[in-house]
């Protein structure tokens, strides 16, 4: 790989920010919104990872909750205002994005709504034309009084449902607990029969969240735009929405990094990072550009600050050395022998960085 061919792509929520904006919007606008969102998110995980519903992709939670956000008064302006006032960056994120933009074409590919992503771009000075995210115009959808009333009744029913359980070894719908199967069947009726027939159903038909295969499509478009190749891409992700781009890039010879990832991310990535700071993103991007995928993987097998000397930008190493000992990033190459441990450790670490409620989400 030539230095000038490297391309940097990252998810937003996780590697760059601590937010789960959709979860937070649900909590802000919808009564008992935290539980409501968590339940719909579990349903999303089951649809995407176990049932593999045709046309369904990880992150479609973001369209499923839209009718309810609208019924409870969410507008473009309210979503933009709330999002801009509640951005929580991972320490170092602004500096990392400035650094990577200097050394290679850099992009954000996020499932998040445009209201949040555009607010974040304004805050950190990232070019909006280098962002792929979920486009939605809330003000376009007018709901009748009857639909608003009915959606509020449905919200109450969903919030009162038992939380779906997903056993670790569940690979089929039949392997799910009976109670979870009943919840999933009822949610199928609600979303794909009742709501789809409402005016609010237009949101489910028209909004296309950038998760799963849509993130992979964004990666393909970025490679085309930059005239590069998948083997020149380094991608940072943290959740189920990154599984498809991870697979695409890995199979194309690029490098995939789980940053404080959950089980879905660690399962598909080649390097696992656990860090309170984005400095490690800057370092991995820098060394990937200089010594390529195999060289970076080799360093990750026996990671140490001393092994980075002579390769990594000295200013990055100085910043790394100023971190407190207990804040030093952990970097490991994922292999069959350590993957179970890394899934456990990364999932737990994720909760300490992003909070228990957000950390548990798929």
Where do the model's predicted regions map?
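Alpha-helical substrate-recognition element adjacent to the catalytic core
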Residues: 1-150, 209, 272, 276, ...
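C-terminal cap/substrate-recognition subdomain and adjoining C-terminal extension
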Residues: 1-3, 91, 112-362
């Amino acid at each position: 790989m030539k230095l000038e061919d490297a391309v940097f792509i990252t998810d937003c929520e996780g590697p760059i920010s601590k937010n789960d904006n959709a979860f937070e919007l649900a909590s802000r606008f919808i009564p008992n919104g935290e539980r409501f969102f968590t339940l719909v998110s579990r349903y999303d995980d089951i649809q995407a990872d176990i049932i593999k519903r045709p046309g369904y992709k990880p992150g479609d939670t973001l369209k499923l909750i839209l009718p309810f956000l609208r019924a409870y008064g969410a507008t473009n302006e309210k979503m933009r205002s709330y999002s801009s006032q509640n951005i929580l960056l991972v320490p170092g994120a602004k500096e990392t994005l400035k650094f990577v933009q200097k050394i290679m074409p850099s992009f954000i590919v996020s499932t998040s709504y445009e209201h949040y992503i555009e607010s974040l771009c304004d805050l950190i000075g990232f070019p909006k034309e280098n962002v792929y995210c979920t486009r939605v115009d809330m003000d376009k959808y007018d709901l009748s009084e009857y639909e608003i009333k009915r959606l509020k009744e449905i919200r109450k029913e969903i919030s009162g449902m038992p939380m779906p359980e997903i056993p670790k070894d569940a690979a089929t719908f039949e392997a799910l607990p009976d109670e979870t199967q009943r919840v999933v069947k009822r949610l199928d009726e609600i979303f794909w029969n009742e709501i789809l027939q409402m005016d609010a159903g237009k949101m489910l038909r028209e909004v296309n969240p950038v998760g799963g295969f849509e993130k992979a499509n964004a990666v393909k478009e970025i490679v085309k735009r930059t005239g590069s190749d998948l083997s020149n891409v380094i991608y940072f992700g943290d959740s189920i929405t990154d599984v498809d781009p991870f697979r695409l890039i890995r199979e194309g010879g690029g490098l995939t990094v789980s940053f404080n990832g959950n089980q879905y991310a660690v399962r598909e990535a080649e390097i696992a990072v656990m860090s309170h700071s984005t400095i490690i993103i800057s370092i991995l991007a820098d060394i990937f550009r200089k010594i390529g995928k195999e060289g970076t993987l080799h360093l990750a097998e026996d990671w140490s600050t001393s092994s980075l000397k002579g390769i990594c930008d000295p200013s990055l190493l100085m910043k790394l050395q100023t971190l407190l000992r207990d804040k030093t990033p952990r970097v490991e190459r994922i292999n069959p022998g350590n993957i179970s441990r890394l899934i456990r450790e990364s999932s737990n670490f994720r909760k300490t960085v992003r909070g228990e409620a957000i950390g548990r989400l798929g």
